[in-house]
């Protein structure tokens, strides 16, 4: 999903939570769990977002065909803890290119949204954010990390999104070798935040939401992603 303003909007009507509602608590075919909302980008065909059964467990399914979409959940918590999830894809997006606008497509994405002080960004990005919030509302997050399943770049590759230097893309899976298999992930949110936006802002920032989805609107390809429950684990 290319980060064009609408992709980052979290539902203003949703009360921010401290824990993420699980997909596995719902029946296949039911509406998304309370707190989750489907997000689509204006003027781009919407991906199919649904709850489906996989190996006896209800998971999130996102199917895209020259389209884009995700499910988002609003949060309000400090930049700390470990984000854990599992995901599966049917194929990679063959023509994707993570640092080019024409190739900004991924078989699966997981976003973490942040509220970061304005002085973390150059004036050009501050101006874009101000305009975006005037157009789309104050709920537009100021920054995000986007964990992706890429087609070819090595795991660990990190780059600014080609549409915004407020969004850092991090490759956590790459290639088709693990396609059609569930893969477990864990990310240290504080460490990833510091790597993307700097140590100085971690204590003054908040996590404002997460999202899971995929997109093929740039390349015109087709891909399906499945996501198990997403959770933020904190040390006891």
Residue ranges and their predicted role:
Residues 86-92, 115-117, 190:
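Solvent-exposed strand-to-loop "edge" motifs in beta-rich extracellular domains
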Residues 105, 109, 115-163:
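Extracellular/luminal beta-rich ligand-recognition
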């Amino acid at each position: 999903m290319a980060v064009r303003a609408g992709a980052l909007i979290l539902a203003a009507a949703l009360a921010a939570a401290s824990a993420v509602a699980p997909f596995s608590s719902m029946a296949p075919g039911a509406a998304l769990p309370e707190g989750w909302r489907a997000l689509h980008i204006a003027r781009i065909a919407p991906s199919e977002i649904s709850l489906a059964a996989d190996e006896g467990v209800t998971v999130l399914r996102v199917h895209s065909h020259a389209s884009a979409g995700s499910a988002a959940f609003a949060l309000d918590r400090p930049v700390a803890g470990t984000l854990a999830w599992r995901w599966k894809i049917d194929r990679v997006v063959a023509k994707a290119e993570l640092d080019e606008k024409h190739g900004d497509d991924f078989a699966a994405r997981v976003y973490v949204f942040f509220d970061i002080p304005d002085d973390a960004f150059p004036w050009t990005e501050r101006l874009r954010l101000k305009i975006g919030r005037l157009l789309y509302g104050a709920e537009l997050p100021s920054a995000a990390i986007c964990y992706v399943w890429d087609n070819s770049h090595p795991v660990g590759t990190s780059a600014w999104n080609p549409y915004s230097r407020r969004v850092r893309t991090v490759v956590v899976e790459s290639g088709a070798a693990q396609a059609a298999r569930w893969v477990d992930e864990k990310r240290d949110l504080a460490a990833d935040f510091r790597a993307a936006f700097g140590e100085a802002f971690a204590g003054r920032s908040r996590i404002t939401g997460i999202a899971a989805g995929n997109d093929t609107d740039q390349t015109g390809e087709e891909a399906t992603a499945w996501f198990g429950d997403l959770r933020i684990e904190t040390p006891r």
